[in-house]
A protein has these predicted regions:
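Histidine-rich, glycine-flanked metal-binding segment
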Residues: 1-39
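Divalent metal-coordination and catalytic microenvironments
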Residues: 8, 13, 35, 46, ...
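Metal-associated gating/positioning segment near the N- to mid-region
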Residues: 33-99
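Short catalytic-loop micro-motif centered on adjacent basic/acidic residues
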Residues: 74-76, 105-108, 237-242
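A glycine-rich helix N-cap at a beta->alpha junction
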Residues: 95-110
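Histidine/acidic residue-rich metal-binding segments in metalloenzymes
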Residues: 114-132, 136-310
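His/Asp/Glu-enriched, well-ordered alpha-helical/loop segment
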Residues: 202-235, 303-304, 308-310, 316-396
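C-terminal cap of metal-dependent C-N hydrolases
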Residues: 323, 327, 383-449
Length: 458
């Protein structure tokens, strides 16, 4: 967790020792973190990049933004329409190499029956987490795929997440103890509600929330949980992404009571800070931001340990593309967030007495590393672990601007917000990649792909 009154000795990219006194220690550099918090490097488990620009370019800007925000490892949510074998995943890995400031890993989205056969191969190359998009089906079946390296024309794919395909993913993933990430929404319900809303001529974030109701999430959570309990693997590890409503939380808690499978909950910073009364289309996201009472529920769940991790669902697009024709229906879903994850948790959480700094370390690093097979390499400050550290000044105030965050995106839902509590140094495997908001250009390429074996979850 958090280190206090201790000196951290780093050698060959690893933590060598934790010592009380460093007066007799010789080192090439000594960093004084007196009065600051030293956290295990933050891990963002939910990042989209490579969709609007090829990964060889997107990795450069978005891993730079990660470093600004104290994130030392980012996990890409990869969507390929073709098979992952046949060197398609190999091309993505090759294009990623040398283009990251921070370490990175990959979740594989399984979108078609043919890709189920790739699950054992994915595990062999260190990808042990699979994504199910329950929201894709009916006539809501189109989604942007990740671009091939060097390609720039946006690529759509048609996906029908049938019960048969979902069951196949859960069964095959559970047999090899993969973590199965779930986007839980019922596309039939959402499609019907969207049609009604358009016929009634309504617009805005409240309309978007109405069209993708929390009970749609709850239904889908119950459905996939039943598949998990009945899986041939003897139970599943289900990780519910971007949970932001009280109804979804209640559904997961109800499934936890039934046992057999393991259930993990991820929320995102925007579900802790924004409601559907926010007056701009830039906050369109799926599932939608909800009500004030939902925001309060998410903080309570975070404080009480019901929420296991915080991820950002970061998407790097430009404002002109984001807003579409200026209405909620043509606007793109998703926005940047990787650089503001820690500042939001520190400012709105720790400094406003909603959560402790220990909770921040747990939900941004320790839990994430354990769930996704990176512990004890990541997620902890102990001898033998990677020297991934985030030094935080809990009293540092900054006004958020897009330029401050150094992403490809030219907007942020936190534009103009004064946040107190910022990372002042991001250390990736012993290398200070960011200091006082400045990212070292020489650190480009330092980030490495992190293969992940079966997770240590207990």
């Amino acid at each position: 967790g958090i280190v206090s009154d201790t000196n951290i000795m780093i050698e060959d990219e690893k933590i060598k020792a934790l010592v009380r006194s460093a007066s007799n220690v010789s080192a090439s550099r000594k960093i004084d973190a007196t009065g600051k918090y030293v956290l295990p490097g933050a891990i963002d488990p939910h990042v989209h990049y490579g969709v609007y620009r090829p990964v060889n370019e997107a990795a450069r800007t978005e891993s730079r933004s990660a470093a600004v925000g104290g994130v030392t490892t980012m996990i890409r949510m990869l969507r390929l329409y073709d098979r992952y074998c046949d060197n398609n995943i190999g091309k993505q890995l090759q294009a990623s190499r040398g283009n990251h400031y921070v370490d990175y890993s990959i979740h594989a989205s399984i979108l078609r029956p043919e890709q189920v056969r790739d699950i054992p191969y994915l595990r062999e190359i260190g990808i042990n987490s699979l994504k199910i998009y329950m929201n894709l089906g009916s006539d809501l079946n189109r989604i942007h795929m990740d671009l091939a390296p060097g390609a720039y024309e946006l690529k759509d794919g048609v996906v029908q997440m049938t019960d048969e395909l979902m069951s196949s993913i859960v069964n095959n993933g559970s047999r090899i103890h993969s973590t199965i990430l779930v986007h839980a929404e019922n596309p039939v319900i959402c499609s019907e509600q969207i049609l009604k809303a358009k016929q009634n001529g309504v617009d805005g974030l409240e309309a978007w929330s109405y069209c993708r109701p929390p009970y749609s999430e709850a239904q889908s959570i119950a459905k996939v949980s039943d598949l998990g309990r009945r899986s041939s693997g003897g139970g599943s590890y289900l990780y519910f992404v971007h949970i932001g409503s009280n109804a979804a939380l209640d559904a997961i808690l109800a499934e936890r009571q039934k046992g057999r499978s393991n259930y993990y909950v991820e929320t995102c910073p925007h579900y802790l800070t924004h409601t559907n009364e926010f007056g701009s289309l830039i906050a369109k996201v799926t599932p939608p931001i909800r009500s004030k009472s939902d925001v309060q529920s998410m903080w309570s769940a975070l404080r009480n340990g019901i929420v296991d991790t915080v991820g950002t669902d970061h998407v790097a697009n430009r404002l002109e593309m984001k807003v579409g024709k200026g209405d909620i229906w043509s606007a793109l879903s998703g926005f940047p967030g990787i650089a503001t994850m820690l500042p939001v948790l520190l400012s709105k959480g720790v400094n406003e007495n909603r959560i402790s700094i220990e909770t921040v370390a747990r939900v941004t690093s320790y839990n994430t590393a354990r769930i996704f097979g990176m512990y004890p390499k990541k997620g902890t400050i102990q001898p033998g672990s990677d020297a991934d550290l985030t030094i935080v000044d809990i009293d540092l105030e900054k006004i958020v601007t897009p330029d401050l965050l150094q992403s490809y995106s030219d907007y942020t839902i936190y534009d103009g917000w004064r946040l107190r509590g910022w990372p002042i140094m991001t250390i990736v495997r012993g290398n200070p990649v960011m200091e006082d908001g400045e990212v070292a250009n020489a650190a480009l390429g330092h980030g490495e792909f992190i293969p992940r074996p079966v997770a240590i979850r207990d």
